[in-house]
Amino acid sequence: MKKRFIIRFLKIFFGILGCLVLAIMLFIGGFWWKYRSFVDVARKEIPAAITGEYPLSSKVDPFIGTGGVPWTCAYNFPGVSLPFGMMRLSPETASMLTSDKALNTSGYFYGDDKIIGFSHTRLVGTGATDGGHFLIQPIADQKLPGETPQEVQHKYSHKNELAYPGYYSLELPDKGINVELTGTERAGVHRYTFDDTKNPGILLDISHTLGDKRSEDAYLKILNDQDLEGHIRSFGSFAGRYGGIKVYFAAKFDTPFAKYQIWEN
């Protein structure tokens, strides 16, 4: 009787264990297939007009060092930066699995399938998380709640991405938004093109930081219907050791605001 009970128990136990192992393998296999399907997509080619004028542009791949498995990379970013420049304007991404911010300390991981927005500062290749200042988030036909802006994450595909030295672009067809980034040594230049049928908007997150870092003492002044200025103190992997770093900005829009709203805390 006891022997039969043990045999029955073992059958049930190993049956449950087998089902659990199978479920885990199916989950891992499904996620791996989804991951490979996303990262293996071919990106846009650099226009002939650019390669004709700047032949060496075709020899540079800004996406090198932005991906890796498992979630390890060279902490590079695909955005805009000039030699010895202060500006490092680039997209930020969120995880395919959890929707958390990219584990890449520069803010962009090639295996992430969501775009959070476009920020202006970061470190490169250090493995230290510092920067992510003044995140810009384009929106279209999105209703915002009365007290705090909803977290904005756009699904995207690498087939709609293009980057070469000094330029980055991304199309978000589902939202009817086209993003273009370029810059100078100390300024980032954004161009957002919206479909005529969309209700366009821009969110500026002054308190944003890369990763799980924090910020405080945000300040914003609206000068007129096209100009803003402000500052923030952020505490990253380096700056947090020395009381944080205070970063200032001035922003100018080429189109006057139809209306604006400010959120705090």
Question: What would you call each of these model-derived segments?
Answer:
Residues 1, 34, 210-212:
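Long, compositionally biased intrinsically disordered regions
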Residues 4-40:
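N-terminal type II signal-anchor transmembrane helix
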Residues 38-265:
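Accessory carbohydrate-recognition regions in carbohydrate-active enzymes
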